[in-house]
UniProtKB/Swiss-Prot annotation:
Motif (Histidine box-3): 289-293
Protein name per Swiss-Prot or TrEMBL: Delta(7)-sterol 5(6)-desaturase
Source species, domain of life: Eukaryota
The record's note on its domains: The histidine box domains may contain the active site and/or be involved in metal ion binding.
Entries under PANTHER family matching the protein: STEROL DESATURASE
Gene name per UniProt: ERG3
Cofactors demanded by this protein: Fe cation
GO MF terms held by the record: C-5 sterol desaturase activity; delta7-sterol 5(6)-desaturase activity; iron ion binding
UniProtKB keywords: Endoplasmic reticulum, Iron, Lipid biosynthesis, Lipid metabolism, Membrane, Oxidoreductase, Steroid biosynthesis, Steroid metabolism, Sterol biosynthesis, Sterol metabolism, Transmembrane, Transmembrane helix
Lineage: Eukaryota, Fungi, Dikarya, Ascomycota, Saccharomycotina
Record membrane topology: Multi-pass membrane protein
Length: 364
């Protein structure tokens, strides 16, 4: 995240913070408080400022250093010191990260889900008896309202990374198995986070936890791509924990981290798009996740079926999900709806918070 933040600080945030909290405000603050809060001090001598910039920009940044003390991608400029809040100030880091993660999260969700809806999504789902009235609007509304809070909860993890508490690194020794190391990291990341999400997901299905946190996401029995992030923000936070824990305990390249975070969001959209293209027994694809939304107690995994098989919660998707003719067959849907209703009764007790497109009594 330091690479992203340094880029945004250089092009945007240095200017923004200079206007919101100019360094001139330091005149009215006691020196002891300035030092305690790590605030910038006014440099009235332009020669001294340029000498400071020259020295600072010549220092080579070590990956473990605290972010903002020395440059890495871009040299420091006069604007770097124009705000009362320096780049490494914890208050500035907090608000900058919250803004970045929120905006990036919203854009990634809306763009990826929209592209999936246009090019991949199976629109026959609109005719499914368990599709809700105004469902897509409700999914987007919940996701857009949840993402800022989810971002807020994850900011402390990114702050730990910025302050040198992670095992993220940048330099790669290509001559000594650097590429192999990178590929192994991708595999271990998927393995570790798949296990972490499985455990978190099973916990979220404990009755009390389910009703408090996870139930909003299971309002969608058949999904559109916009259901991918439509859940309670604390639910989303717990399911993301393994992504943040991994770089705290295992090495991971910084660029790989950004790529994998983008991939995770893409995957979340994909398994909610209703397009059952893969029936791979290893991959926890769209069909497996459709089974989870319909029948609640199966297929908790994110990327693979490994942990569900080990945990006894794997359920093979029905063949009808992969047959375009059978997928929307009336008898198949009626059987599916009856079984889903039984699981709703078992898990939730009633179905009063759902209004279906086909439910004339509720819609009239």
């Amino acid at each position: 995240m330091d690479l992203v933040l340094e880029t945004l600080d250089h092009y945007i945030f240095d200017d923004v913070y200079a206007k919101i909290a100019p360094v001139e405000l330091q005149r009215g603050i006691d020196d002891s408080l300035v030092n305690a809060l790590s605030l910038n001090k006014i440099v009235s001598n332009s020669t001294l400022l340029h000498e400071t910039l020259s020295i600072t920009n010549s220092l080579k940044r070590v990956n473990k250093d605290v972010y903002g003390l020395t440059p890495f991608l871009f040299d420091f400029t006069e604007k770097t010191y124009a705000s009362l809040l320096p780049r490494n100030n914890l208050i500035r880091e907090f608000f900058s990260l919250w803004a970045v993660v929120t905006v990036f999260g919203l854009l990634l969700y809306l763009i990826t889900a929209s592209l999936s809806y246009v090019f991949v999504f199976d629109r026959t789902i609109f005719n499914h008896p368990k599709y809700l009235k105004n469902q897509m609007y409700l999914e987007i509304k919940l996701a857009v309202s949840a993402i800022p809070t989810m971002s807020l909860l994850t900011v402390p993890w990114f702050m730990l990374e910025l302050n040198g508490y992670s095992k993220l690194y940048y330099d790669v020794d290509w001559e000594h198995h650097g590429l192999r190391k990178l590929l192994i990291e991708y595999a271990t990341f998927i393995f570790f986070t798949d296990c972490g999400i499985y455990l978190a997901h099973r916990w979220l299905h404990w009755p009390r936890v389910y009703k408090a946190l996870h139930k909003p996401h299971h309002k969608w029995l058949v999904c559109t791509p916009f259901a991918s992030h439509a859940f309670h923000p604390v639910d989303g936070y717990f399911q993301s924990l393994s992504y943040h824990i991994y770089p705290m305990i295992l090495p991971l390249h910084k660029i790989s981290y950004l790529i994998l975070f983008t991939f995770v969001n893409f995957w979340s959209v994909m398994i909610h798009d209703g397009q059952h293209m893969s029936n791979n027994p290893v991959v926890n694809g769209t069909a497996c996740h459709t089974v989870h939304h319909l029948y609640f107690n199966y297929n908790y995994g994110q990327f693979t079926t490994l942990w569900d098989r080990l945990g006894g919660s794997y359920r093979r998707p029905e063949d009808s999900l992969f047959d375009p003719k059978l997928k929307m067959d009336k008898k198949v849907l009626e059987k599916q709806a009856r079984e889903t209703a039984a699981y709703i009764q078992e898990v939730e007790g009633d179905d009063t918070d759902r209004v279906y497109n086909t439910d004339k009594k509720k819609t009239n």
